[in-house]
Amino acid sequence: MTRTPQTVHSMVKSVLWRVPSSGTKTEVFLTFDDGPHPQLTPWVIEQLKEHGDLKATFFCVGNQAAKHPEIIKNLRNAGHEVANHSQGHESGWSTSNKSYLRSYLECEEELGVTSRFRPPYGRITPNQARALSTRTQVVMWDVLSGDFDRSRSGGDCLKSLQKLTRPGSIVVFHDSEKAAPRLLYALPEYLKWLKKEGYTVQALPEKTEISQSTKWSGGHSSQAKVG
């Protein structure tokens, strides 16, 4: 599992791939995709608490949030950030711009207003990214845990995480059924390793407020209109 190629990074300048690091800062930014899950998400919350009351950003699917509103509430009560991962986990590559942006808005309505969006599978077209960037911060990553890959073990995931992590990294885990066997091993071991290596774990930093004049409202803004 490798970092995302730099050629992809340059496609859309407004997309966040990694948090710039300066001086002696050693922050790492943990993110969790595809939840909430009725067993795994509470377990992740507990792991983060046990390892130092750490904070993370959870990119939640609207359909899942509708099934488990109490978990969304618990995430926020614990000080974690809840962010948008679309309503139905659609790939931008195989979804029309209109449908993709509608999915974003439906998830936004389900979760309440959020300040970030992560495209499912990391698949988003430049037009979709530019349109959404007028409304929200589109966030990708530079380190994948690989916990979704059934051909890998939890140990494989941990080795990749240890090899690729650097100051400012945005790291992706998944609080999903598919990822569970690898997540359950890799996450606690990774948190121990981060502490040993002197890293500080954070939720993603606050984004600069977007001007009201550039916010997208369902395709009516000329700045946000796509294809």
Please provide the spans of the model-predicted regions:
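C-terminal domain-boundary segment and adjacent tail
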Residues: 10-23, 50-52, 66, 181-227
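Glycine-enriched alpha-helix->loop->beta-strand junction motifs that scaffold or abut catalytic
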Residues: 52-54, 77-82, 133-141, 167
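His/Asp/Glu-enriched short active-site or ligand-binding loop at hydrolase and phosphoryl-transfer sites
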Residues: 123-164, 198-210
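Conserved strand-to-helix beginnings and helix N-cap segments that scaffold or border functional pockets
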Residues: 41-42, 68-69, 97, 151-154, ...
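Active-site beta->alpha N-cap acidic-glycine motif
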Residues: 2-95, 99, 106, 113-114
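A cross-domain feature marking catalytic cores of carbohydrate-active enzymes
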Residues: 32-34, 58-62, 84-86, 119-121, ...
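Generic structural signal for well-ordered alpha-helices
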Residues: 45, 69-73, 101-108, 129, ...
